[in-house]
C-alpha cells in the first residue's frame, strides 16, 4: 500500500471514529483527493460543494463544504480545524477515542519525491552560485 493510500486510510478511520455516533455513513475520497463525508443525508449542490446534514438536527443547520478549500486530501484537516466550532455546533463534540489519532495529531509527512526535488533544487542553487563566483 502506498504512503498516499495509508494516509487516506488513516484519515478515513480518524473521521469515522470521531463522528461515528453522528450517523456518518462513509468517508470517500474523490480522484482529486477531495474528501466527501457521507452523513445520513447530504446534498451535492454542484461539483464544487457538498452540504452535510445530520439526522435529528434542524435542517437549516448544515455544514457547507466548499471543495475548492478542500481540494487536497490533507487540507481537510485544515478545513476541519478552521470550522471546528461550527462543526461541533452541528454534530456535537466528537467522542474521545483512543483508537484513532486526533485530527490535530495527524500531519502531512513529506513524500520522498518532494524531498528529492528539494535536494535537487538546493544542488542547482549551489552550482549556480559557484558559477557566479567564478565570473
Curated annotation (Swiss-Prot):
Stored InterPro entries: PHA01746-like_dom
Coiled-coil intervals: 68-135
Region (Disordered): 88-135
Keywords attached to this entry: Coiled coil
Protein name: Uncharacterized protein ORF135
Residue ranges, compositional bias (Basic and acidic residues): 118-129
Positions with biased composition (Acidic residues): 102-117
Organism: Acidianus filamentous virus 1 (isolate United States/Yellowstone)
Taxonomic superkingdom: Viruses
One Pfam family from the record: PHA01746
Keyword Coiled coil set for record: yes
Amino acid at each position: 500500500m502506498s504512503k498516499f493510500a495509508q494516509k487516506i486510510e488513516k484519515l478515513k478511520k480518524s473521521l469515522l471514529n470521531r463522528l461515528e455516533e453522528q450517523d456518518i455513513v462513509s468517508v470517500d475520497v474523490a480522484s482529486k483527493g477531495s474528501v466527501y463525508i457521507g452523513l445520513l443525508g447530504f446534498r451535492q449542490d454542484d461539483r464544487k460543494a457538498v452540504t452535510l446534514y445530520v439526522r435529528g438536527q434542524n435542517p437549516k443547520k448544515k455544514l457547507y463544504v466548499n471543495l475548492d478549500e478542500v481540494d487536497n486530501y490533507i487540507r481537510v484537516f485544515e478545513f476541519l480545524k478552521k470550522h471546528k466550532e461550527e462543526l461541533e455546533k452541528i454534530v456535537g463534540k466528537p467522542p474521545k477515542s483512543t483508537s484513532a489519532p486526533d485530527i490535530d495529531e495527524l500531519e502531512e509527512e513529506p513524500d520522498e519525491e518532494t524531498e528529492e526535488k528539494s535536494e535537487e533544487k538546493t544542488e542547482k542553487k549551489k552550482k549556480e552560485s559557484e558559477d557566479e563566483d567564478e565570473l
